Regions:
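Alpha-helical membrane-protein architecture signal
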Residues: 7, 11, 110-122, 149-153, ...
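Juxtamembrane transmembrane-helix termini in multi-pass membrane transport proteins
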Residues: 3-73, 136-157, 171
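Alpha-helical transmembrane segments and their lipid-water interface positions
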Residues: 45, 49, 53-61, 83-89, ...
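Selective transmembrane alpha-helices of multi-pass membrane proteins
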Residues: 66-98, 162-165, 169, 177-209
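Flexible cytoplasmic inter-helical loops of multi-pass small-molecule transporters
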Residues: 92-112
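Short, conserved phosphate/pyrophosphate- and ester-handling motifs at nucleotide-, phospho-/glycolipid
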Residues: 21, 127, 194
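Kinked, hydrophobic transmembrane alpha-helices enriched for aromatic residues
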Residues: 126-139, 200-203
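Hydrophobic/aromatic residues within the transmembrane alpha-helices of Major Facilitator Superfamily
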Residues: 14, 18, 51-52, 88, ...
C-alpha cells in the first residue's frame, strides 16, 4: 500500500466524517451536556469500533454478514433498537428535568467514563452502514496477500481522521457550552438530540443489502 493510496482513503473517510450521523451526534450531545472529557472518551470508543470493524472485515465476517439476509436484519435491528434507546433516554431526561429549581441536597447522577466509552463503541459497532462501507471500499485499497495488516492500517487511519474531526467538534462545542447550560436550553437540547437519534434509527431501519 502506497502513501498516495492511504491519503486517498483518508480523504474519503474525512468527507464521510463531516456528514452528520449517529457518532457525530453522540459526540456533540456529550460535549454540550457532560463536558469535553466524556466526549473525548466517546471518541475513543468510536475509534476502537473502527478497528474492530476493520478486523472483522479482514476475517471475512462482514462478507458473511452481508450475504445472510437474516444475520444482516438481526444486526440492523440491534442498531435501530440502540439508537431508539439513546433517543428515548434523552427525551425522558428532558421530561424529568425541572426548570424551576434544583435541589442541592439531591445527588447528581454523573456518568462514568466507562459508560461514555461503551456508548461510543456501541454507536459505531451497531451500525451496519459501516459494515457495508468496508465491504465496498476496502477491496479497492487492500491486497489479498496482506489483507489483515492493510485492513487494520485502514481502520487505524479512519480512527485517526474521524477522531481529529471530532476533537474539532468537541472544542467548538465547549465554546458554546457556557451559553447552552441553562435548564431551559438543556431541556430542549435533550428533546432535539433525542428526536435526531430516533430519526437516525428510522433511517437505519430502511437500510438494505
Amino acid at each position: 500500500m502506497t502513501i498516495d493510496t492511504l491519503v486517498a482513503f483518508a480523504g474519503i473517510v474525512f468527507l464521510l466524517a463531516i456528514i452528520p450521523g449517529p457518532n457525530a451526534l453522540l459526540i456533540l450531545y456529550t460535549s454540550l451536556t457532560q463536558g469535553k472529557r466524556f466526549a473525548v472518551v466517546n471518541t475513543l470508543g468510536v475509534s476502537v469500533g473502527f478497528l474492530i470493524h476493520a478486523f472483522i472485515s479482514a476475517q471475512g465476517l462482514s462478507l458473511l454478514l452481508s450475504q445472510s439476509a437474516m444475520a444482516f436484519s438481526i444486526f440492523k435491528w440491534l442498531g435501530v433498537a440502540y439508537l431508539f434507546w439513546l433517543g428515548i433516554n434523552n427525551v425522558k431526561a428532558a421530561l424529568n428535568q425541572s426548570e424551576l429549581k434544583i435541589d442541592p441536597k439531591k445527588a447528581t447522577l454523573t456518568p462514568s467514563l466507562s459508560s461514555s466509552f461503551i456508548k461510543g463503541l456501541l454507536t459505531n459497532l451497531l451500525n451496519p452502514k459501516i459494515v457495508l462501507f468496508y465491504l465496498s471500499i476496502f477491496p479497492q485499497f487492500v491486497s489479498p496477500q496482506h489483507l489483515l495488516e492493510q485492513s487494520m492500517l485502514l481502520g487505524l487511519t479512519q480512527a485517526m481522521v474521524v477522531s481529529s474531526w471530532f476533537l474539532v467538534v468537541i472544542l467548538f462545542a465547549s465554546k458554546l457550552k457556557a451559553m447552552l447550560t441553562t435548564p431551559k436550553v438543556t431541556k430542549w437540547l435533550n428533546y432535539v438530540s433525542g428526536g435526531l437519534f430516533v430519526s437516525f434509527g428510522v433511517s437505519l431501519a430502511s437500510a438494505r443489502l
